[in-house]
């Protein structure tokens, strides 16, 4: 555990202020010089603001001096500054600057009856929570999720004699509602895509996620987008399996093809960049064109938008080497590629897909419109056996460990004891433990 803190930033240092005056900046055609009452009994605070919609009389959210604001993994501190020769002692904030929404078309303007001086955490009804930041070593891909960390915590508690249960929500509620939107899957490069699962939902309403889901994502440094995209991020962080969602109307020919394209082909990604492809870039395509660089980043136009009604969820196992090389080739690093590069659980695709579909039914009102397609390569890694000698354990750790304690720890870590003799154990290791050899 690297750090334990309250919910990311906890909106600490952010308060409701009232803009008393608002004048055009003497040396800028787009900035304004404001004075703001922060409700602290002191003189009004001078703040230079670049938002086009700031005006006298507004109730706004103000980041006071010393406040930390976050943008993903980055943080910056509000300091006294001088903008075009005018001193500024704080910042009037937009939604996205404090992590409560996506809006950046001007500052947030609050209702007129909002009390001046009210902490932003109170205004947004921010519930108390704790964020535990865990430093994951590069070889522990299995721990890149809440479920993965929970497995290790469970083993630790069991080893220390604390009665503990490990529970993962079941997926028994998953059921196909109709067969109105079938999509076929074809894998042309099975050495690069060892498993591809997909399911469609019809009649979804794309909208903001409920407050509980937005707050979960904001807490861990992710920005809410819409209910469908947020579901994929939530499931990935919870269980370690990256997902991708497509607008089903964009899947020409009703078919997903996992393949490569000729060297030099072009593709425009979600960030608007036109990229020249290698013939070693694995792509998720429809019957006519590419839609996504597998495991790395989606294509422009193939995602979900306000007008989307039918979606396809993808849950796959892409070979770590292929994803790593594509990500580096294009200078991209995403939460999905981070996990695929290190190796996700080869048995985790169906569970994650079902959880996403169930959440989509709950939050977007869709109906599951096909049987899950699950295409696997014979080379897909399953559980495997290793031999462990007690003497090796003693030498590695530097002291002798009782055999019964070794067995307890290994069993708690989901290692199955196949056989045992006086020298050691034969173990069956779950496929998700890519660090075990």
Language-model features, listed with the residues they occupy:
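Conserved mixed alpha/beta core segments that line enzyme active sites in large multi-domain catalysts
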Residues: 2, 18-46, 117, 214-215, ...
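Glycine/proline-enriched, intrinsically flexible loops and inter-domain linkers
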Residues: 6, 24, 165-265
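Terminal amphipathic helices with adjacent charged low-complexity linkers/tails
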Residues: 153-188, 363-392, 400, 436
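Noncatalytic alpha-helical scaffolds and linker/capping helices
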Residues: 10, 377-437
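A glycine-rich phosphate-binding loop feature that marks nucleotide/adenosyl-phosphate handling sites
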Residues: 7-12, 79, 168-181, 231-239, ...
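Phosphate-backbone binding interfaces of nucleic-acid-interacting proteins
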Residues: 1-177, 312, 328-331, 335, ...
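Conserved phosphate/anionic-ligand binding catalytic regions in large, soluble enzymes, centered on
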Residues: 51-62, 138-157, 221-246, 288-308, ...
């Amino acid at each position: 555990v690297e750090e334990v803190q309250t919910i990311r930033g906890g909106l600490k240092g952010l308060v409701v202020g009232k803009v008393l005056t608002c004048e055009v900046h003497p040396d800028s055609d787009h900035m304004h010089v404001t004075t703001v009452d922060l409700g602290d009994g002191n003189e009004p605070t001078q703040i230079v603001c670049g938002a086009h919609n700031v005006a006298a009389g507004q109730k706004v959210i103000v980041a006071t001096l010393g406040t930390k604001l976050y943008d993903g993994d980055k943080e910056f501190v509000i300091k006294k500054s001088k903008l075009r020769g005018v001193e500024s002692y704080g910042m009037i904030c937009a939604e996205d600057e404090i992590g409560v929404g996506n809006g950046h078309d001007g500052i947030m303007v609050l209702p007129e009856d909002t009390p001046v001086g009210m902490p932003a955490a109170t205004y947004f009804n921010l519930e108390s929570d704790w964020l535990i930041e865990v430093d994951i070593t590069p070889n522990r891909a299995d721990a890149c999720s809440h479920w993965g960390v929970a497995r290790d915590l469970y083993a630790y508690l069991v080893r220390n004699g604390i009665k503990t249960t490990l529970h993962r929500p079941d997926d028994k509620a998953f059921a196909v509602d109709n067969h109105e939107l079938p999509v076929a899957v074809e894998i042309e490069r099975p050495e690069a895509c060892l498993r591809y699962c997909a399911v469609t939902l019809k009649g979804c309403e794309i909208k903001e996620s409920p407050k509980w889901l937005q707050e979960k994502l904001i807490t861990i440094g992710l920005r809410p987008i819409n209910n469908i995209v947020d579901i994929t991020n939530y499931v990935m962080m919870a269980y370690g399996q990256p997902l991708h969602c497509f607008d089903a109307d964009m899947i020409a020919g009703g078919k997903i093809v996992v393949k490569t394209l000729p060297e030099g082909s072009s593709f425009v990604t979600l960030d608007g960049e036109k990229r020249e492809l290698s013939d070693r870039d694995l792509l998720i395509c429809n019957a006519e064109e590419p839609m996504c660089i597998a495991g790395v980043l989606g294509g422009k136009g193939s995602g979900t938008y306000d007008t989307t009604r039918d979606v396809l969820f993808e849950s796959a196992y892409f070979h770590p080497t292929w994803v790593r090389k594509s990500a580096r080739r294009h200078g991209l690093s995403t939460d999905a590629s981070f996990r695929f590069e290190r190796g996700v659980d080869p048995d985790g695709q169906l569970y994650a897909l079902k959880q996403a579909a169930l959440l989509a039914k709950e939050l977007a009102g869709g109906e599951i419109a096909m049987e899950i397609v699950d295409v696997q390569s014979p080379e897909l890694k399953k559980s495997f056996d290793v031999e462990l000698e007690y003497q090796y354990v003693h030498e590695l750790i530097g002291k002798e460990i009782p055999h019964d304690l070794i067995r307890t720890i290994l069993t708690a870590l989901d290692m199955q004891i196949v056989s045992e003799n006086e020298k050691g154990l034969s173990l069956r290791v779950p496929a998700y433990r890519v660090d075990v050899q």
